[in-house]
Regions:
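Structural signature of beta-strand start/N-cap positions in the alpha/beta core
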Residues: 11, 61, 116, 158-160
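Ser/Thr-centric signal marking residues that sit
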Residues: 15, 43, 104, 145, ...
Length: 174
């Protein structure tokens, strides 16, 4: 997505956290143009509160945001649905669904008129084998996007999800 955006003339700022930060750095190295990277933990309110300041170091405003964030602890995947502890479920839902709202609202002050938020999704209508609480989190992501679209439409902010089909992720390996 970042490469295509740059090829269309967009300036891109990337975020990452934890193990994902090193992956983001590797991906940034393959882009046609250098892209700044901001460390962002969507479960850390201080990171979210400081996001506008960090982005403004590179861009005056945002035309759009891509939400490509998802995580579920190993205990929330792999066929242990009935025995998963709430802490693991809460982590999956916070990182994979609530973060769409958190990220969108953290970026809202930077949105230019007509801004767009696009999130990456996977089919939450099917109880996929071993996907377990990540499937529930994806269903929550879909619902979250509808409520954000309802509430931010008045600000001319569009919220959409796209499902690219199965992608090799940690959750897919379960």
């Amino acid at each position: 997505i970042a490469r295509l955006a740059q090829e269309e003339g967009a300036q891109v700022v990337l975020t990452g956290f934890g193990r994902g930060l090193s992956l983001t750095t590797r991906i940034a190295g393959r882009l046609p143009k250098p892209a700044p990277i901001i460390e962002l933990d969507v479960t850390n309110q201080e990171h979210l509160d400081g996001l506008v300041t960090e982005v403004k170091k590179h861009l005056p405003h945002l035309d759009g945001v891509v939400h490509s964030i998802g995580f579920a602890p190993e205990a929330a995947l792999g066929g242990n649905f009935l025995n998963t502890a709430w802490e693991d479920v809460a982590t999956a839902v916070q990182v994979s669904a609530y973060s769409l709202k958190s990220l969108t609202m953290a970026c809202h002050p930077l949105f230019k008129d007509g801004a767009s938020v696009v999130g990456l999704d996977f089919d939450a209508q099917v109880a996929w084998p071993k996907y377990d609480w990540m499937g529930v989190a994806k269903a929550a992501l879909e619902s979250t996007s509808r409520y954000l679209a309802r509430d931010l439409g008045k600000d001319n902010v569009r919220i959409n999800l796209i499902a690219a089909g199965p992608i090799r992720t940690i959750a897919a390996k379960s």
